[in-house]
């Protein structure tokens, strides 16, 4: 608005030719002073945004950026490849680069397409178009993503996902942190003898896809992986689905919420809506929202509570006009793992809002099958892994012809070699990489080279040659001109 008014003022002053120059100068000066005053209000006044309060204080940048529970991972002795996770604040999502640990949270203005596809297909809510924040603490996805450790501050144990066991307590900066180890983590490379196409995976309900992916590798063209059984659907018994859709037995809205089956309208802040159901024991429970959208408003927060009254999860709903709207159709809110079955979920709306949705449901994913799936994938795992700059080397003893998936995001620039022979890399499990391996002992090597690096070096060299030739010709031309004169 200020920019528009300034532009109109300049146009007006230019068109009014008879206006004295001193008045024009005074108008421009006055406009400049007003702009400074407005900027000051926006930066410092609490009623106009107080933008300065969001800035990091001088001298505290590193401390703020690394103020994550994962800062204690330097005291964990483990030479294997793994990733670590902790619930993070926005300011610490780049901490892994500073503290040099492998995490599952990062900020990047350009996320890779396969990664975006994975988060959408899995109904994940822990991401935006510019950042990833883990896998919603879903045990099946953590296993595939090599998430081996989770760190929590003391008193947050109720958020612990399935399969994590305490291995160490660490005192740092007068705060106790507990390190938990995932008992169901997969190694960097693991194998399958079954594959399924992405098209067929999409025919399976979103909450069940993660379980399928631990039994059959997802590839774009299964016919290119003939050594593995092509699982067309789950009806032939080769794929098991233990997850269940749970009937919602009741919905209770307080006086500030209405729900007609397609629209939820909250007319006041902290309005609540409670879903009642009879869940499953020893399960992760998910709230499934299909077609969730908010036509008006930029963003609004919804939080979710379960039996103990503690918030287990929250989600920021972004309006359709919001630049960072993920444009996904299905959302799975992880209400957490519990040994006892969950029986209700309270949804709290932090402000007035109206949201539309096509379906609202509860799903439960039993966790007992997870260990057997992981053990099957680990039977012929990548071993003796060596991580070097832009290079990964490991060995495998394959009992038969198989398909190996790596917990490395798929992107151009990677090349794979089996016993020194280059082999094709497939996009596997939507966002990861996979290759063929034959029966027997093999050495696997992965190399990374930034796409376009070689051609850019060639262009640079050619440009320097052209530039040098131009300088020489110009110098000779100058000499010839001097002689002629």
At which residue positions do the language-model features occur?
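A cross-kingdom signal targeting lumenal/periplasmic-facing segments of multi-pass membrane
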Residues: 105-198, 202-245, 323-334, 338-344
């Amino acid at each position: 608005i200020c920019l528009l008014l300034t532009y109109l003022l300049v146009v007006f002053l230019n068109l009014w030719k008879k206006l004295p120059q001193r008045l024009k100068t005074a108008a421009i000066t006055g406009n400049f002073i007003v702009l400074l005053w407005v900027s000051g209000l926006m930066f410092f006044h609490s009623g106009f945004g107080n933008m300065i309060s969001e800035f990091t204080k001088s001298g505290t940048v590193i401390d703020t950026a690394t103020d994550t529970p994962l800062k204690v991972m330097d005291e964990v002795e483990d030479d294997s490849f793994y990733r670590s996770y902790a619930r993070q604040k926005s300011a610490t999502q780049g901490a892994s680069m500073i503290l040099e640990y492998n995490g599952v949270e990062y900020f990047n203005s350009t996320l890779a397409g396969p990664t975006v596809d994975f988060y959408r297909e899995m109904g994940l809510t822990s991401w935006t178009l510019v950042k990833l924040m883990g896998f919603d603490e879903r045990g099946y996805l953590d296993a595939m993503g090599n998430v081996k450790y989770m760190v929590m501050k003391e008193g947050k144990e109720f958020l612990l996902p399935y399969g994590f066991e305490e291995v160490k307590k660490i005192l740092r900066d007068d705060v106790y942190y507990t390190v938990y180890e995932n008992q169901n983590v997969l190694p960097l490379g693991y194998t399958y003898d079954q594959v399924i196409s992405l098209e067929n995976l999409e025919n399976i309900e979103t909450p069940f896809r993660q379980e399928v992916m631990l039994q059959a590798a997802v590839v774009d063209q299964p016919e290119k992986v003939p050594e593995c059984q092509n699982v067309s659907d789950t009806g032939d018994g080769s794929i098991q689905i233990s997850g269940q859709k749970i009937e919602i037995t009741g919905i209770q809205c307080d006086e500030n919420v209405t729900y007609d089956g397609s629209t939820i309208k909250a007319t006041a802040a902290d309005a609540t809506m409670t879903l009642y159901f009879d869940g499953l024991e020893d399960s992760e429970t998910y709230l499934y929202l299909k077609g969730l959208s908010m036509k008006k408003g930029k963003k609004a927060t919804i939080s979710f509570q379960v039996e103990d009254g503690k918030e287990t999860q929250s989600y920021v709903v972004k309006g359709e006009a919001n630049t960072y709207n993920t444009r996904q159709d299905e959302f799975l809110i992880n209400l957490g793992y519990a040994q006892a079955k969950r029986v209700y979920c309270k949804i709290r709306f932090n402000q007035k809002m109206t949201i539309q949705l096509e379906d609202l449901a509860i799903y439960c994913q039993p966790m007992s099958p997870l260990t057997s799936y992981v053990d099957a994938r680990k039977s012929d795992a990548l071993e003796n892994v060596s991580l070097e700059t832009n290079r990964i080397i490991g060995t495998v003893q394959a009992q038969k012809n198989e398909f190996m998936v790596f917990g490395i995001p798929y992107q151009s620039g990677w090349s794979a070699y089996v016993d020194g022979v280059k082999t094709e890399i497939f996009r596997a499990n939507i966002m990861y990489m996979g290759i063929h391996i034959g029966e027997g002992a093999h050495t696997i090597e992965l190399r990374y080279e930034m796409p376009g690096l070689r051609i850019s070096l060639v262009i640079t060299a050619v440009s320097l040659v052209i530039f040098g030739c131009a300088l020489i010709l110009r110098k000779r031309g100058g000499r010839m001109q001097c002689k002629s004169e």
